[in-house]
């Protein structure tokens, strides 16, 4: 069984975050929300967020800046920008700088939003399935599995 995809939404408007929560609560994602773009790096690192969806126009920081930071710290995280401000230049800049994978315009269409997130989910699950095991973890597992007892007998741990 695959683990649920973790999605973080950043928007300075609490009403938008509440609407997103209602729209997506039954989609099988583990959802996180914040109005503070300065919390994003901490949340992405602590919770191993798979997808970050950021509003563009926020008082403290733009969505492009938030998603560029996520890209720098966690390059494999899928990044999506969502905005009601059809700022074509910012969108082009974000795409050209590789900050975003998708752009969603507000007001969003619920079905389209769900489809975008499920498409990202499928891509993430394929990446997980194809991922090479972490070498450090493989060594730890190997050492737990094969041990030598005091008499020199090799003991294989069934775990």
What do these predicted ranges mean?
Residues 33-51:
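Acidic, metal-coordinating helix/loop segments flanking the phosphotransfer/catalytic sites
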Residues 122-159:
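CheY-like receiver
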Residues 5, 35-36, 62-65:
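Acidic catalytic/metal-coordinating carboxylates
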Residues 107-117, 121:
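C-terminal output helix
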Residues 42, 64-78, 93:
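Short amphipathic alpha-helix used as the core "switch/output" element in two-component signaling
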Residues 11, 55, 83:
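Active-site residues of response regulator receiver
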Residues 58:
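Receiver (REC) domain active-site loop signature in two-component systems and cognate sites
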Residues 2, 14-33:
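Two-component/phosphorelay signaling modules centered on CheY-like receiver
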């Amino acid at each position: 069984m695959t683990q649920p995809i973790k999605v973080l939404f950043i928007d300075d408007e609490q009403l938008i975050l509440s609407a997103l929560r209602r729209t997506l609560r039954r989609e099988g994602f583990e959802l996180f929300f914040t109005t503070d773009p300065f919390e994003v790096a901490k949340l992405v690192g602590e919770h191993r967020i798979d997808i970050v969806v950021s509003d563009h126009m926020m008082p403290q920081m733009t969505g492009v800046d938030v998603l560029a930071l996520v890209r720098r710290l966690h390059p494999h995280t899928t990044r999506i920008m969502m905005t009601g401000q059809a700022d074509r230049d910012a969108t082009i800049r974000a795409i050209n700088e590789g900050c975003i994978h998708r752009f969603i315009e507000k007001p969003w269409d619920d079905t389209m939003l769900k489809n975008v997130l499920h498409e990202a989910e499928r891509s993430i699950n394929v990446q997980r399935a194809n991922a090479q095991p972490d070498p450090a973890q493989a060594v730890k597992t190997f050492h737990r599995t094969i041990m030598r007892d005091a008499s020199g007998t090799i003991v294989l741990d069934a775990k």
